Every structure is written in C-alpha cells, then in structure tokens.
C-alpha cells in the first residue's frame, strides 16, 4: 500500500478549493432569461406541479439522482467516535466516490446527535430532498435501530453501507472463493470474528445464500457468542451457538473452512491458520491492519484463499464496487427501498462479473499483464467500468420484480448502454 504522509493528506484537502466536492449547475444560466427560468418567476411552475403531484419532484428536480450521505460521526473508519464535524472529510470522500463511480450526486450531512430517536427525526425531516439515504459511520447497536426505523418510515431507499456494502461484496467474494476451492456454502464451517454492524449483516446475508446456522460460530471481544452467555444484545443472540466445545478463537478456527474477520489486526496467528480445513478461505477485513497479513497466511497455508481490505494484495473487499451501483439502480427506477432481493441481485452480479474475461485496462491498472478468475482473482477490481452496467441493471431489475420500483425500464438494452456512458460524462 502506498505510504501517504500526514502533510500530503492535509495538503490534498486544503489546497485550491478546500474539501473534495462542489455543486455544479446543470441548466443554462448565462442570460437574464435563463435566470428567470431557474428562479423567479419561472420556478413557480414546477413548484405548483409538485404540490399537485409529489412524485413529479423526480421530473423537475434532482431528487432522482441525489443521495444524502448522513453520519453522526460515532464510528468513523478506524478513528471511532470523533464527532459529526470531524467525520466530514470521510463523508465528502464518500460523496466523491458516489459521483465518480456511479454518476450519483450527493450531499454530505453531518448530524451532531447521539440519541437514536432524535437522529431519526432529523433524517426524516430532511428526507424529501433526496432520492436515497446512505447512512455512514454510525456505531452499533444504534445503527440497527436507526436503519430499521428509517426504512420503515420513509418511501425512499435507505442503506447503512457499513453493514450492507461489506456484506454484499464479501458475499460475492465468498461464493466465488467457494467455487474455486470446490466447496458448497451449505457444507462449510464458518467463523466470523467480530459482532458489530458489518459482521451481523455479513452473517445474515451468508445465511440467505445457504450457510447453515449450525455451521456458524461468531465471536466478539469476550469470546464465542453462545446461548449460555447473558451479556449479549438481541443482534448477537441471533447468532448464538449452543455448542459447548468452543470458547476461544483458537478453538473455533480448528477445522473451519472459512474465517471472516471484522475485528482487529493481528488477532489470528499461523497456528490457527494451519488448524483450518483443507483449502481454507480467509477474509481478514480489519483495517488498516488485517487480522493476519496476506504473507503470513500464505506462509502458514500455501493453499489458502485470502482476501483483505487492502489494495496491495489480491482480492480486496472494497465497498466501492457496491454502493455506487446499488444506489444507481435503485434511483433509476425510483425505488421505495433497497430490499433483500436487490442486495442479493448485487451479490450475484458482482460474483458473475469476476468470472468473465477481464479487459486489459483493468489488469494494466494494477501492473499486471492479465487477470484470470481463480485463487488470486475472484472479486472484480474497482476500476472495472463494467460494474456500473452489470450491478446497476441487476439491482434495478430486482427492484421492479420485487415490487418496490415506481418507474419501469422499458428498454433494457438502451438502459445498459446509457449506464456504460454515464461515468464518462
């Protein structure tokens, strides 16, 4: 991973126009007539149309391509609870990624509120502005209540990306990794180390794809989450095991086919990796330091399939290959939600793309001559421009088929062609 100095990072954000995003007009504005259309008196006409038919906001405003990136700064990357304002650079960065990868406009909104109920009310009050809401960096367990309530009480897509983005990308990677090693998800034994928002969402999604609950062991900072424990919340209790033979990570890893780490760095050692089943799969997703490094895992078990959150090793789990395209597809059909069928469609589309021949420009971006589906490539790269077409169209189709779309797509070939050019605009 390229080393970045503190001063380089500060200069990047400060020099020129401070920050990373700006508002750009989309209509002519050079003449007095243009301005009279953009504002008074011409602006009254779309206002009156929207008053009569609220859905016309999608016709006359940018609502249909606008997402709010909303955070209270209570769980910012590896920084923890740094507060709403200090989290603003991260939210601006998320907005930048929405635009460059998905062509989605977004406003970053930092809400200085820790109380879940008051936070929910703030988001509901500003929701009419947006076509979708991306919740970001909100600590568990409050994030579960906040997302659940907002999904139920708003008629636009709401997604907490820290939960579902990680789950979707890792699930796509898991399905492909299992194919490479010749195992079925229904048969594997899995260890999930971590029980926060991302870990809970990952486990739920894996189960929906066939993982058996009895084959899953989840751990938090106090050890295995078991039915015998009385110190666990309702989200953790959902994954409590009744096994009495495992109490520690070392015991849980013995004979496991899959390890998914969403915890802290350097918690897995070589002996644990050696104790795993034949051709084990390790997703060490703690950032910036994974639970075990790629080199250490490979040294312990040359047959391991490995994924991390880092760019300098194969098979990076990176949410940017998910959220811009999930929201793109949801916005394009004016969806009222991002539901399970849409998330599952994203998983399948991402997994399928990795199995297709890879364009030369993708391999060259990583200094490689070629990329071929297998142990060192089972997750698409973020620079792959096919993602916007495949994932967005899959999500849009799932929204229509599951009944949450308010705007149909009549010509799928034309839609896919438009997606292919969108990020070039």
Where are these regions (language model features)?
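Solvent-exposed alpha-helices and their adjacent loops that cap or buttress functional pockets
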Residues: 58-63, 99-100, 125-127, 151-152, ...
């Amino acid at each position: 991973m390229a080393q970045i100095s503190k001063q380089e990072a500060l200069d990047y954000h400060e020099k020129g126009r401070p920050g990373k995003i700006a508002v750009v007009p989309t209509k002519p504005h050079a003449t007095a007539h243009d301005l009279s259309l953009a504002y008074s008196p011409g602006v009254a006409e779309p206002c009156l149309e929207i008053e009569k038919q609220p859905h016309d906001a999608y016709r006359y405003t940018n609502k249909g391509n606008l997402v709010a990136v909303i955070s209270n700064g209570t769980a910012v990357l590896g920084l923890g609870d740094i507060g709403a304002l200090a989290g603003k650079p991260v939210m601006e960065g998320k907005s930048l990624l929405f635009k460059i990868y998905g062509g989605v406009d977004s406003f970053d909104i930092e809400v200085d509120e820790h109380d879940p109920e008051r936070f929910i009310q703030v988001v509901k009050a500003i929701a009419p502005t947006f076509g979708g809401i991306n919740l970001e960096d909100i600590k568990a367990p409050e994030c579960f209540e906040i997302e659940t309530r907002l999904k139920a009480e708003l008629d636009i897509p709401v997604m907490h990306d820290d939960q579902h983005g990680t789950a979707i990308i890792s699930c796509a990677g898991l399905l492909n990794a299992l194919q490479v090693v010749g195992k079925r998800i229904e048969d594997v034994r899995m260890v999930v180390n971590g029980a926060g928002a991302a870990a809970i969402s990952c486990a739920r999604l894996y189960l929906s794809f066939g993982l058996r609950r009895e084959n899953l062991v989840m751990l938090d900072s106090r050890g295995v989450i078991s039915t015998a424990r009385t110190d666990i919340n309702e989200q953790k209790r959902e994954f409590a095991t009744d096994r009495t033979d495992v109490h520690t990570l070392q015991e849980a890893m013995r004979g496991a086919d899959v390890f998914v780490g969403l915890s802290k760095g350097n918690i897995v050692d070589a002996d644990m990796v050696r104790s795993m089943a034949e051709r084990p799969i390790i997703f060490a997703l703690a950032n910036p330091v994974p639970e075990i490094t790629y080199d250490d895992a490979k040294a312990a078990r040359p047959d391991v399939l490995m994924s991390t959150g880092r760019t300098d090793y194969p098979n990076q789990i990176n949410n940017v290959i998910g959220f811009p395209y999930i929201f793109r597809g949801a916005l394009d059909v004016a969806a009222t939600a991002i539901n399970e069928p849409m998330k599952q469609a994203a998983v399948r589309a991402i997994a399928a793309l990795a199995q297709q021949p890879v364009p030369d420009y993708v391999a060259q971006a990583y200094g490689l001559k070629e990329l071929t589906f297998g142990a060192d490539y089972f997750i698409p790269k973020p620079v792959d421009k096919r993602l916007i077409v495949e994932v967005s169209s899959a999500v849009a189709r799932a929204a229509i088929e599951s009944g949450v779309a308010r705007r149909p797509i009549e010509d799928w070939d034309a839609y896919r062609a438009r997606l292919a050019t969108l990020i070039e605009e």
